[in-house]
Design a protein with these regions (language model features):
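Non-globular, low-confidence helical/coil segments that flank catalytic cores
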Residues: 7-193
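Short, exposed "boundary/linker" segments that immediately precede the start
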Residues: 1-6
Length: 193
């Protein structure tokens, strides 16, 4: 499994690292602790799963797909990555929206890692024991000097399930990472305004 990782120890220009990911397809800055912010994009095929770590917290943004054949990227890709990084419990699981390529593996993560918070952009079946909360623009929190903020959805009713995606902004040392789910051009434009 290919993993793209960005680890920040000190204030660094994140755009340089993100550009490298886009240009070269792989980035491994450093896996040594202590880091202030570590963002790992996991290869889950068509889909998305991002693991965000601070020194004392862990968040998973989307869990990739599951298939009728029984293959589940939450179980087969994300869970082993979390375990190999010493993560046995999640502070938060964010499921941007209900499309299988983002939400399919989430139930396996809920079962294995018992997230303290489950944030969703729209209703997602994560098992009978899972209580979810809808992400909303304006929700914000700090972990270990790193700020997390939901920028979308707001109170406006969106017609497309893609446009109901949770959009998460992560800020550290004056730099920003945006996890947009599957928002479309119209929502992107509104976020830029």
């Amino acid at each position: 499994t290919e993993i793209y990782t960005l680890s920040l120890h000190d204030p660094l220009p994140i755009w340089k690292y993100l550009s490298a990911v886009l240009l070269f397809g792989v980035l491994s800055v450093s896996a040594d602790k202590p880091y202030r912010l570590r963002v790992s994009v996991l290869d889950v095929g068509q889909g998305l799963s991002v693991v965000v770590q601070t020194p004392s917290h862990a968040l998973v943004y989307d869990a990739g797909p599951s298939f009728s054949s029984g293959y589940d990227t939450g179980k087969s890709v994300v869970a082993p990555f979390l375990r190999s990084n010493g993560i046995s419990m999640l502070d938060m699981l964010v499921v941007s929206h209900s499309d299988n390529d983002h939400a399919g593996g989430a139930a396996a993560l809920v079962q294995r890692f018992h997230p303290l918070q489950l944030m969703v952009g729209e209703p997602v079946d994560l098992g009978s024991v899972a209580e979810t909360e809808h992400c909303q623009r304006g929700m914000s929190w700090w972990w270990d000097g790193v700020q997390f903020s939901f920028l979308h959805p707001g109170h406006r009713q969106e017609n497309s399930k893609n446009n109901r995606s949770c959009v998460l902004q992560i800020q550290y040392a004056g730099q920003s990472i945006l996890l947009p789910g599957d928002i479309e051009a119209g929502v992107e434009q509104r976020l830029l305004e």
